[in-house]
Amino acid sequence: MQQLIEKASTLMEALPYIRRFSGKTIVIKYGGHAMADEKLRKSFALDVILLKYIGINTVVVHGGGPQINETLKRYGIVSEFVKGMRVTDKETMGVVEMVLTGQVNREVVGYINQNGGRAAGLSGKDGDLLICEKLLQEVKSEDGSTETVDIGFVGDVVEVNPAILQALEKGGFIPVIAPVGVGRAGESYNINADVVAGKVAAALNAEKLILLTDVSGVKSKEGELLSSIPLAEVPALIDNGTVTGGMIPKVTCCTDALAAGVKKAHIVDGRIEHAILLEIFTNVGIGTEIQA
């Protein structure tokens, strides 16, 4: 009987959050280990389905770096990276688009649908969802001067047209977006999935942006998880070296989304089963929340 009472208490803890977020939009960036482990794939699918059933409009943006790397290797194509961005020539872009839209997107849609949801896959080219311009990288030369580097078909999202997402949501579908955008001349662009999630969240005036990662969240210099960070404190955390390396672009993605109107952003460990539900529907959460 005590176990049943504890289950009821868990549901009651979630109730105020369900009431608060019903009818709102949450955008989730899905990637990392959560995509590779069968048990985590199922828990992710069930989390997303539950959100939809309780009235939360859920949009998924997925990555696919490991799958792209594997396919490029099979084709004998060697990738170069500039400041963490893959140099994407026309041949590489063809492989990237094939993997993201033809393989990974279908897989994500498939396991949501197989577990009782109604997902619909699309890329940023569908309905001109993600309009891009070429992203140029500024790098420092050995002599200290700054040089602009063309890294190929890597896109900077300059416009989001969310009508197709709104139509899918009204139809009861969970949109699943592959991070491939389109240029003004119809050319395809490879886009960072975190950036896509942030831009889409802003365009939909989302309540939350959630980035699933392979780390527990933002940590202090002593290694302790920072469960909540005010937006105004983020620049200092970067300047003093608390936020470093690959966490910087993720945190920047969150702050950009908040500045554009998203209410809260979360960096959550996707290696934990039901990480999304634990972050949203519990009093403490399990990751890092950044709030305006």
Swiss-Prot record:
This protein's record includes keyword Hydrolase: no
Class of the enzyme per the UniProt entry, highest EC level: transferase
Primary location group: cytoplasm
EC number of the protein: 2.7.2.8
Matching SUPFAM superfamilies: Carbamate kinase-like (SSF53633)
Keywords: Amino-acid biosynthesis, Arginine biosynthesis, ATP-binding, Cytoplasm, Kinase, Nucleotide-binding, Transferase
Biological process annotations from GO: arginine biosynthetic process via ornithine; L-arginine biosynthetic process
GO cellular component terms attached to this protein's record: cytoplasm
Gene3D superfamilies: Acetylglutamate kinase-like
InterPro entries membership: AceGlu_kinase-like_sf, AcgluKinase_fam, ArgB, Asp/Glu/Uridylate_kinase, Glu/AcGlu_kinase, NAGK-C
Pathway noted in the entry: Amino-acid biosynthesis; L-arginine biosynthesis; N(2)-acetyl-L-ornithine from L-glutamate: step 2/4
Keyword ATP-binding carried by entry: yes
Catalyses which reaction(s): N-acetyl-L-glutamate + ATP = N-acetyl-L-glutamyl 5-phosphate + ADP
One Pfam family recorded for the sequence: AA_kinase
Marked site (Transition state stabilizer) residue numbers: K29, K250
Residues involved in substrate binding: G64, G65, R86, N190
GO-annotated molecular function: acetylglutamate kinase activity; ATP binding
Location within or outside the cell: Cytoplasm
Similarity remark: Belongs to the acetylglutamate kinase family. ArgB subfamily.
Name this polypeptide is given: Acetylglutamate kinase
